[in-house]
Every structure is written in C-alpha cells, then in structure tokens.
C-alpha cells in the first residue's frame, strides 16, 4: 500500500471581479480572479511512506473562497481513467495505422468534492493550471486558467455567467415516435426488488470505453493531436463522474484519431452515421481492439439541432453498443453531458417525461432538450436503467479489472483493491466499513474480509451458505465455499429444459417466452397478440419480417413466423402492435431460444427442433 502525499493549495482570492472575458470555454460575463499557491503537508502522524516519483500528486486539496466563504476542494486522481491496455491510434499520410501504448497512468485528471458537503462533486484537470468544475451548495462553478502573463491567475465563475454560443436548444436524435409508452415508467416506481436483484444492482459495473475522433474534428483543432487527446481525457473524466451515480466506472481503453481520412461516411444524417459507425465497430474495430462501448466524436453539423444519437438498450451488443456525438461546444461540460445522455440510451434509459423532475433547478441528463450542462440522472432514469439491467443482464459490464492488471501505484482510498491492499473502503471521511482500516487499507484485527456476498460481520460465511438465489426456473442457486468472500461463478440449468409451466425452454439461464418479452418491451398489462398477427411476418415489409439483409426486409417462412417480429396487445385490444427503432432492426424481434412450438425453439430467426441446437 502506498500512502498518497496530501497537498493543500491556498487560493488567494482578490476582490477583483471581471465584467467580461473570453476564456477557453467561451465568453464569461462575470468572474473572480484567484491565484493558487501550493503548500505541501505531510500525512497524519508526520511520516511519509516512500512512493514512486510521479509528476502529479495522488491527492490534493484546494482552499479558496466562494461568495466570501472559505471552502476546501478535496481531489483524488481518477485512478481508473485508463485501462491497463490503453492504446492510441492515428494514421500516417500513406494511410498506415500507427498504434502506440503511451504511459498514461501518471495523469492529471481528478475527481473530488467540497469538504463537509454531502451533495458535492468535482471533475478537475491539473495538467496546465486548474480546469474543470465543482458543485457547491447546489450551484455549479467553473475554474480555468487565465491566459495572462501571470500564469498563476485563474478565473472562477458560475455556469449562468457563460454566454451561450447558440441559444437554440440541442436535442437527441432518438425521436418521440420511437419511445415506449409512459406506462412502464409509472409502474416502475412500484417495483419491489428481491434481495438477489438488489445485490446485483449494487455490484460495481465497468464499461471499457473506446473513442474515435473524426477527420473534421482533427482539422478543427488544427491537427494538434495533444490538444485533441487532452480534450477527450477531460470529457471522459467528466463522463466518469456522471455515470458513477449509476454505479458504473468508465475506463478509457482506446482512442483513435482519423488523421488521414474518415473510416466511415460521416454525414449530416445522424441515423446513417450511427449505422455506419456501428458496422465499422463490428467489422473493423472489435477484431483488433476489444471494448464494451464506443463513441464517435465529430465536428460535422448534424441535421436540425441534433447533437447525438445512440441505440436504446444495446450495451454489450456487437453492432449497436455505439453512439455518435457532435463536438458542438467549446465547453467540455456540455459535450460530456451529451456523451452521458447517449450512453444512457445504450444503458436502456429513454428520455425523461415531464413528471421526471428530480434534478433540482438543472435539467436532468436524459432531458429531451439541452441548453445547459447536466450532471444527474432523474429517479425515472435510474428506475428504467435498473429494469433494463435486470431484464437483459448485459454480461460485459461485470468484467472487473484484475488486481494485477492495474499497473499504476496503489492508492489507498480510491475504492479499488490493488496490489498490497486487503480492502479499500474509500477515504477515512467516507469509509463506512467495520472491517477495513481506511488509513492503511488493511483488514482490522481478526477480520477475514470486508465485502462480498460471502462476507458477513468481517468473516467468511460458512460452507453452504446461500449467496445467490436462483433467479428463475432456469437458474441454480450458488453457495459459499467457506474460503472466500466472493460468491462462486453463476451457473444455470442446461439449455432445453421446460420452464414456466412449459411455456418455454431454458436458454443460457433464462426462460424466454413471448409473454415476458411483451411485458419487458411495453410494460405490465400486455399480452401476446393473436396468432394471425404473426402472419404479417410473411409480408417482408412494415414491421413484418424475419431479418434484414442489405437494407431489405426478408419475410419469414410460414413455419418461422413466431421467430420474426414480436406482436403484443394491450389489455383486450385487437390491434397488432409491434415496436420499431429505425436504427436498430433487431429491436422488438423474438429472442433466440423462445418456444415456437412443442419441442421447437427460435434460432437464427428460424423455428427448429430442440435437439438441433441444444
């Protein structure tokens, strides 16, 4: 375990306030000037443990005044900002791909909070002065260096003091016609989760994130790759603070700059660009660089006021776990809000309705329009995201980085258990563990564990203690070994066994049925449509088809009609309802493994015998 150097920075706040100034983030009409001065302090006890020499401290504090009141901004380096196998790529003039593994672990990007404030957060870069934002008493403040001869001068200002580059509200390309009804949102508030579901929701989840920068953005920043990389790092650092509220950690696994030419046809039609980017990720990127989710940053002006688009509920999908983002603002907080919004769609979250107002005076992340940066998901978004996780259980987000994969020096207090640590419950201020010593990241006397499904009262649970209940007919319970705090790997019943009173057959631990799929897509009080609705799948047009091939809808054979588009009905309605997303032809299709007849299941959009696939 390596203890971090604690440094206090005193900011001398001068009574000068500027009336208007042009900063990197745009025109600011009211600001304060401050002068940081660094004062090093030893850790508690007056002893500093030896640690590898780094350019940037692991932990820093900044003291300054806001509205005449002193505050202390506590910051800790964002330890997991980059994955262990992070790479960068650009292209030579002759088109050759040049991939490097730069040393990025000694970086200058921090997360933090105002001390003694429960509802506070911060995202700051300290690469060249202090640049970023922090939340204090419900207000968002920004700090950035003033480009004056006095290099220590910084400006502090409120979000409301930044003049808008364009007053027109920015929107997401996921249109209202593609939304689900309000009913699932209202009923979501009535959900009561089982203990097993609650445990799953509380487990830390990870997204290995890849960013591609198009040629227009490369030229916009005057072909300056270091400036582009710094902007992307700042964006991902902010994105991390936002997604942390959903218990996600974003690890940047790769960045590539299309410095020679674009790898796809980036066009003003945002839907076409998203589709092309998804295909490029599937065919070109994934074979050479694994990732859970990828976003394209572009300087093209999408049609209308659209600044981004993503497929709904598509995380971990090979083709659809993507988004396209217009780099439309100088302000990283604005663009990062859009990145979080589109990633929210990938995480199964739709746009907020008018009733979703739990973000104070600011708009929530999933608001339909944006004129100001946002940093919070509404309670509606959180519930919808939880429904998505419990329904789809995307597997890629559970890949926790191994301790040995973390190559930077261990930092006690960052919630990551690293080499030399037995536990990590956060800083002494935040730690709520009775088993872990927050100052040393070692287990307390006689404690065997600190956390985990098989850890109880600081001891390993007994052999045979149930740590994960069976989720349904197709799952099996897991039990503790008595030698570890972790629950054994999830196992399930073999594929093809009958489930849910013979309504379906087990498939990879789930019991896919038409009824359950209708409820998942449209909420409660829905049923499967009558059989005649499924004959529409023989037409090969509208919402009746089995697959897409070269942009054309391929009809189902008569025996396969219940393996194509899913048709549902509300209550006693006779209407044949189907759900379509223009950018995702697989949305609303009958799932693989669904029963389509006695002893028959859907496989590759065909109704086949159980014995041929299981």
UniProtKB/Swiss-Prot annotation:
Keyword Cell membrane assigned: no
Q: Which CDD domains does this chain map to?
A: ZnMc_adamalysin_II_like (cd04269)
Positions of short motif D/ECD-tripeptide? 473-475
Query: Is Plastid set as a keyword in this record?
Result: no
Q: Which Cys pairs does UniProt list as disulfide-bonded?
A: 316-396, 356-380, 359-364, 412-441, 423-436, 425-431, 435-458, 449-455, 454-480, 467-487, 474-506, 499-511, 518-568, 533-576, 546-556, 563-602, 596-607
Where is carbohydrate linked to this protein? 187
The pro-peptide lies at 21-188
Q: Name one GO molecular function term.
A: metalloendopeptidase activity
| Boundaries of every Disintegrin domain copy | 409-495
Fetch the PANTHER family from UniProt: ADAM A DISINTEGRIN AND METALLOPROTEASE DOMAIN, DISINTEGRIN AND METALLOPROTEINASE DOMAIN-CONTAINING PROTEIN 28
Subunit composition?
A: Monomer.
Name this protein carries in UniProt? Zinc metalloproteinase-disintegrin-like BmMP
Instruction: Tell me which species this is from.
Output: Bungarus multicinctus
């Amino acid at each position: 375990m390596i203890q971090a150097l604690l440094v206090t920075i005193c900011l001398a706040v001068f009574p000068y306030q500027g009336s208007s100034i042009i900063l990197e983030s745009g025109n600011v009409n009211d600001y304060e000037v401050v002068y940081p001065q660094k004062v090093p302090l030893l850790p508690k006890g007056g002893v500093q443990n030896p640690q590898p020499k780094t350019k940037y401290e692991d932990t820093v504090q900044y003291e300054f005044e806001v509205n005449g009141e002193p505050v202390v901004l506590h910051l800790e380096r964002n330890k997991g900002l980059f994955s262990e196998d992070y790479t960068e790529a650009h292209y030579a003039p002759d088109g050759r791909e040049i991939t490097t593994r730069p040393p990025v672990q000694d970086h200058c990007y921090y997360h933090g909070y105002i001390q003694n404030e429960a509802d506070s957060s911060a995202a700051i870069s300290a690469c060249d002065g202090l640049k970023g934002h922090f939340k204090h008493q419900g207000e968002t403040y920004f700090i950035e260096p003033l480009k004056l001869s006095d290099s220590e001068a910084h400006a502090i200002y409120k979000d409301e003091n930044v003049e808008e580059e364009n007053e027109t509200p920015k929107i997401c390309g996921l249109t209202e016609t593609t939304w689900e009804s309000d009913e699932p949102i209202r009923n979501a508030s009535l959900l009561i989760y089982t203990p097993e579901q609650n445990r799953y929701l509380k487990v830390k989840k990870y997204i290995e994130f890849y960013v591609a920068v198009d040629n227009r953005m490369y030229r916009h920043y005057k072909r300056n790759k270091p400036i582009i990389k710094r902007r992307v790092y700042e964006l991902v650092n902010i994105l991390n603070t936002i997604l942390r509220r959903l218990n996600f950690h974003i690890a940047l696994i790769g960045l590539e700059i299309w410095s020679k030419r674009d790898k796809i046809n980036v066009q003003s039609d945002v839907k076409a660009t998203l589709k092309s980017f998804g295909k490029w990720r599937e065919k070109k990127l994934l074979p050479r660089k694994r990732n859970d989710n990828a976003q394209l940053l572009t300087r093209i002006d999408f049609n209308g006021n659209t600044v981004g688009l993503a497929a709904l509920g598509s995380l971990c999908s090979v083709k659809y776990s993507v988004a396209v983002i217009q780099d439309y603002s100088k302000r990283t907080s604005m663009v990062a809000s859009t990145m979080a919004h589109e990633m929210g769609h990938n995480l199964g979250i739709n746009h907020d309705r008018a009733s979703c107002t739990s973000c104070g005076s600011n708009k929530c992340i999933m608001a339909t329009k944006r004129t100001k940066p946002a940093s919070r998901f509404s309670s509606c978004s959180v519930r919808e995201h939880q429904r998505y996780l419990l329904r789809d259980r995307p597997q890629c987000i559970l890949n926790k980085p191994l301790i040995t994969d973390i190559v930077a020096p261990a930092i006690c207090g960052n919630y990551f258990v690293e080499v030399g640590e037995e536990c990590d419950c956060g800083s002494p201020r935040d730690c709520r563990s009775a088993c872990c010593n927050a100052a040393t990241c070692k287990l307390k006397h006689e404690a065997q564990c600190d956390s985990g499904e098989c850890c109880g009262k600081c001891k390993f649970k007994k052999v045979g203690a149930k740590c994960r209940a069976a989720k349904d007919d197709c799952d099996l319970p897991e039990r503790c070994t008595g030698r570890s705090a972790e629950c054994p790997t999830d196992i399930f019943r073999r594929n093809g066994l009958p489930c849910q009173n013979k309504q379906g057959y087990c498939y990879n631990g789930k019991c896919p049925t038409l009824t359950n799929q209708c409820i998942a897509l449209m909420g409660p009080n829905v049923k499967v449509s009558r059989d005649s609705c499924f004959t529409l799948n023989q037409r090969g047009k509208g919402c009746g088809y089995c697959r897409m091939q070269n942009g054309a809808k391929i009809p189902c054979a008569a025996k396969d009609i219940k393996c194509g588009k899913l048709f549902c009905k509300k209550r006693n309605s006779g209407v044949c309802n189907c759900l379509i997303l223009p950018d995702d032809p697989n949305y609303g299709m009958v799932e693989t493994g669904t029963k389509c007849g006695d002893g028959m299941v859907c496989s590759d959009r065909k109704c086949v015998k159980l014995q041929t696939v299981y």
